[in-house]
Amino acid sequence: MAVPHHLQETSYLLPPDPEDWEKQGIPDFVYGQEDLVGKEVQWPRDSPSAVDTVPLSRFDSALRSAWRQRLELGLFRYRLEDLQTQILPGSVGFVAQLNIERGIQRRRPQNIRSVRQEFDPEQFNFNKIRPGEVLFRMQREPKGPATPKQEDDVLVVINVSPLEWGHVLLVPAPAQGLPQRLLPGVLRVGLEAVLLSLHPGFRVGFNSLGGLASVNHLHLHCYYLAHPLPVEGAPSTPLDPKGCIHLLQALPAPGFLFYTSGPGPDLEVLISRVCRATDYLSDREIAHNLFVTRGAPPGPTSSTSDLSGIRVILWARKSSFGIKESGAFNVALCELAGHLPVKTSQDFSSLTEAAAVALIQDCLLPETQAGEVRAALVALMAQEEL
């Protein structure tokens, strides 16, 4: 009789001797449908900052313990301490954090010229990382014919220039040399990672080329942030009669909202819709960012305390190629969602909501082009039943 995977003893820690790291091989984090948690995760009622008291899932424990060990071993470019954090006064609720080291120490972005640029094995890629940087391999346990087969390995790798605690990358089939273009398989694992976590602030995201992805090798970002974000409960309006796609309202960056109540057939529908939308944008050289978080159902009024499903927000934006050093922060997946990692103490102390909004809106598409994209994505969703 097989031992249930939640009872199996697997170590995600490295052996003491670095020479043994490569010999150990990559451990598997095996999970099944029963590990995916839908509606039970909430921010603590009295104070969201008390989130460290919430119970951890098996996934959280594996990721956090392995990540902490790599931090102690000095495998990161800097030692991440508790980040100074402030909620900017105003109606949006921006969460600003001072992260000086990331601004200084992070790897220099690659020379990107196109949203559809091919993978270049000569450039830095995730086949060139040290063995100790890989935490584990995500391994979906099939349960019957209805469960999608996981076709490729998805590695969980530390981001050596972390934004926040537990910042890792999901890297699918690294040996295949996939360019930074979203694919259904890795999006599925990203969504399932959110459902595997009991932490309401575990987020997943994707930057396209031209959307400030710094490495042209397919990867998603995952990290913990112990604060609610504006996108979790922002109101929305449906863009099509069936409610396949919504437009987020009352935020500096209106985004396309896709929603699912949790694991099950609807998750596969959402994955298909999102990837058709990102394919459309990539094919037309339109840069984009994507953010996945627990959040409220679509509708005119919502609350950040309602985390009854999964929100996937997609932003089409102006392409940004090359290194951008101006401004208090660079605008990518977390900034569009309301999390602002600020690069200098001076900018952190002087940053206002109005200045943050101006920086973000400067990266958005002109209204005419934004309207064309909106109409095209609505038409794309309408083809679902044709």
From Swiss-Prot:
The keyword Cytoplasm applies. GO terms for cellular component: cytoplasm. The keyword Zinc does not apply. One of its GO terms (molecular function) is GDP-D-glucose phosphorylase activity. It catalyses: GDP-alpha-D-glucose + phosphate = alpha-D-glucose 1-phosphate + GDP + H(+). Its main location: cytoplasm. Keywords: Cytoplasm, Guanine-nucleotide releasing factor, Hydrolase, Nucleotide-binding, Nucleotidyltransferase, Transferase. Its EC number is 2.7.7.78. GO terms for biological process: glucose metabolic process. Specific and highly efficient GDP-D-glucose phosphorylase regulating the levels of GDP-D-glucose in cells. Belongs to the GDPGP1 family. The orthologs in A.thaliana are GDP-L-galactose phosphorylases catalyzing the first reaction of the Smirnoff-Wheeler pathway, the major route to ascorbate biosynthesis in plants. This is GDP-D-glucose phosphorylase 1. The lineage of its organism: Eukaryota, Metazoa, Chordata, Craniata, Vertebrata.
